[in-house]
């Protein structure tokens, strides 16, 4: 079993990482309170970046609470595909309680996985097992 940690290697750290995702969006998963943008990476694991503006979450306490929730739900998703993911906050996020935020994020992570599976071609179709 993998350790469910959140090391630096699972975060988008540089502005160039964010720019690459914004310029090459392959998956977009909308929600009333969040928007997830994702782009494939070659690392073999997912990385996440967070963008929560003062316009949508006025108080730093609110921004930090939501960011903690996003990081925690991301950390508990070890089976996410190799994607660079940006989570953007939308208006109305400050009115949600922690349980609602957590359930919304878990739903979004499942939608990301589902959309990724649908967008990538199945390798087993071209080469059925046992036939060579």
UniProtKB/Swiss-Prot annotation:
A Pfam family this chain is assigned to: Ribonuclease_P
InterPro entries: Ribosomal_Su5_D2-typ_SF (IPR020568), Ribsml_uS5_D2-typ_fold_subgr (IPR014721), RNase_P (IPR000100), RNase_P_CS (IPR020539)
Enzyme class name: hydrolase
Assigned GO CC terms: ribonuclease P complex
The organism's place on the tree of life at top rank: Bacteria
Signal sequence interval, chain numbering: none
GO molecular function list: 3'-tRNA processing endoribonuclease activity; ribonuclease P activity; tRNA binding
EC number of the protein: 3.1.26.5
Entry keywords, A to Z: Endonuclease, Hydrolase, Nuclease, RNA-binding, tRNA processing
Gene Ontology biological-process entries: tRNA 5'-leader removal
Catalysis: reaction(s): Endonucleolytic cleavage of RNA, removing 5'-extranucleotides from tRNA precursor
Quaternary data: Consists of a catalytic RNA component (M1 or rnpB) and a protein subunit.
Family per record: Belongs to the RnpA family.
Protein purpose: RNaseP catalyzes the removal of the 5'-leader sequence from pre-tRNA to produce the mature 5'-terminus. It can also cleave other RNA substrates such as 4.5S RNA. The protein component plays an auxiliary but essential role in vivo by binding to the 5'-leader sequence and broadening the substrate specificity of the ribozyme.
Family annotation (NCBIfam families): rnpA
Protein name: Ribonuclease P protein component
Protein's organism: Marinobacter nauticus (strain ATCC 700491 / DSM 11845 / VT8)
